[in-house]
UniProtKB/Swiss-Prot annotation:
Mitochondrion recorded as keyword: yes
Residues spanned by motif BH3: 146-160
Name of the coding gene: Bcl2l11
Cellular localization per UniProt: Membrane; Mitochondrion
Keywords: Apoptosis, Membrane, Mitochondrion, Phosphoprotein, Ubl conjugation
Name of the protein described by the UniProt record: Bcl-2-like protein 11
Main subcellular location: membrane
PTM characteristics: Phosphorylation at Ser-65 by MAPK1/MAPK3 leads interaction with TRIM2 and ubiquitination, followed by proteasomal degradation. Deubiquitination catalyzed by USP27X stabilizes the protein. Ubiquitination by TRIM2 following phosphorylation by MAPK1/MAPK3 leads to proteasomal degradation. Conversely, deubiquitination catalyzed by USP27X stabilizes the protein.
Amino acid sequence: MAKQPSDVSSECDREGGQLQPAERPPQLRPGAPTSLQTEPQGNPDGEGDRCPHGSPQGPLAPPASPGPFATRSPLFIFVRRSSLLSRSSSGYFSFDTDRSPAPMSCDKSTQTPSPPCQAFNHYLSAMASIRQSQEEPEDLRPEIRIAQELRRIGDEFNETYTRRVFANDYREAEDHPQMVILQLLRFIFRLVWRRH
């Protein structure tokens, strides 16, 4: 059976907060509206906080929302979830387990990065250095343009030369039909060799 809000004796944590007896809410009949508001007691600021200001649930703590099982009850307006209460998968509250603290964030000044992170950082720095080395100074740019033009001229020459040689070999091969077959086999062999 689920524990009622009246069974909870305090909302303050174990850091010196004083335990206060639980107040029993007035009983509502089953058909009564659940949107009744109660006056907050104990804190004149109107925050409804019964814990001392030094506790984690002090005046700056966000208000806890009722759980999904508490909102089904007509008394859900009196339920306030505490940090001491944890809920198992069945929805019942228990005091047995404590919530684990949030994991600490990575302090970049004291912690070394993980090996994958180190490898990725090394890759990024290597790529940055390659980009910097590809940016040549202005005094080398004319030589690079000349080299690119010479390469283009060489590529054009190779393209026209291979066409002439292939055309001449084909004309000579017309005289010898076996040479046509050998030239085609050689071409197929080169094509297959390049694909592997």
